[in-house]
Curated annotation (Swiss-Prot):
<dbReference type="InterPro" id="IPR000308">
    <property type="entry name" value="14-3-3"/>
</dbReference>
<dbReference type="InterPro" id="IPR023410">
    <property type="entry name" value="14-3-3_domain"/>
</dbReference>
<dbReference type="Pfam" id="PF00244">
    <property type="entry name" value="14-3-3"/>
</dbReference>
<protein>
    <recommendedName>
        <fullName>14-3-3-like protein</fullName>
    </recommendedName>
</protein>
<comment type="similarity">
    <text>Belongs to the 14-3-3 family.</text>
</comment>
<dbReference type="InterPro" id="IPR023409">
    <property type="entry name" value="14-3-3_CS"/>
</dbReference>
<dbReference type="InterPro" id="IPR036815">
    <property type="entry name" value="14-3-3_dom_sf"/>
</dbReference>
Length: 259
């Protein structure tokens, strides 16, 4: 007799355990099991956040690796070290294959389970934003037609999320603010549209400021943190010393990504 499949509760507990141990690949596996077992039912807010945090950490490590390797590649190219450049390109390809696999995994899960089963506006925006995020991560390293396709898919997902967020969520809602933050980063980094990026970030910030007094205690910390990130990016993007600043553009960190 084969052992019984772990229950939904057991998988959630194991995901929390994996998070504590910083074993994020396994955390992803546990939360994917939860997402697949619920089928047509929605994930709870806690489950949704655990899934987001798991994937954010798994993808975050590779994105950081890719940036470091790409930076070294540029330096070696400028020095004319062709042998090193060839080795680096191969290694970068390995990281890109991992990035593609991770993004494909969560995007399939979003399309097959998470987006179709979401009914509440908050969860719809959350998952569509997530869909946009992972298409954006693909656009960061893809080139040519693949990059164009990833960018178009990002725009589509973010716009769908934005339509619902503007109609259904308060300007101070952390998910609406997180969407504005990441959407503006997409305009700036992927579409090279600083004006659009600044307009979107400024509008989101101004609208939230005007309704700050309506902010509930439970989301005050998350909302004000994202507002600070929006303001940081605006300062960076509008400054004349853009190139020299060297600051990393702020996007929703894993702390707020999972809200």
């Amino acid at each position: 007799m084969s052992p019984a499949e772990p229950s939904r509760e057991e998988n959630v507990y194991m995901a929390k355990l994996a998070e504590q141990a910083e074993r994020y690949e396994e955390m992803v596996e546990f939360m994917e099991k939860v997402a697949r077992t619920v089928d047509t039912e929605e994930l709870t807010v806690e489950e949704r956040n655990l899934l987001s945090v798991a994937y954010k950490n798994v993808i975050g490590a590779r994105r950081a690796s890719w940036r470091i390797i790409s930076s070294i590649e540029q330096k070696e190219e400028s020095r004319g070290n062709e042998d090193h450049v060839a080795l680096i390109k191969d290694y970068r390809g390995k990281i890109e294959a991992e990035l593609s696999k991770i993004c494909d995994g969560i995007l399939k899960l979003l399309d097959s389970h998470l987006v179709p089963s979401s009914t509440a506006p908050e969860s719809k925006v959350f998952y569509l934003k997530m869909k946009g995020d992972y298409h954006r991560y693909l656009a960061e390293f893809k080139s040519g037609a693949e990059r164009k396709e990833a960018a178009e898919s990002t725009l589509l997902a973010y716009k769908s999320a934005q339509d619902i967020a503007l109609a259904e969520l308060a300007p101070t809602h952390p998910i609406r603010l997180g969407l504005a933050l990441n959407f503006s980063v997409f305009y700036y980094e992927i579409l090279n549209s600083p004006d659009r990026a600044c307009n979107l970030a400024k509008q989101a910030f101004d609208e939230a400021i005007s309704e700050l007094d309506t902010l509930g205690e439970e989301s005050y910390k998350d909302s004000t943190l994202i507002m600070q990130l929006l303001r940081d990016n605006l300062t960076l993007w509008t400054s004349d010393i853009n190139e020299e600043a060297g600051d990393e553009i702020k996007e929703a960190s894993k702390a707020v990504e999972g809200q």
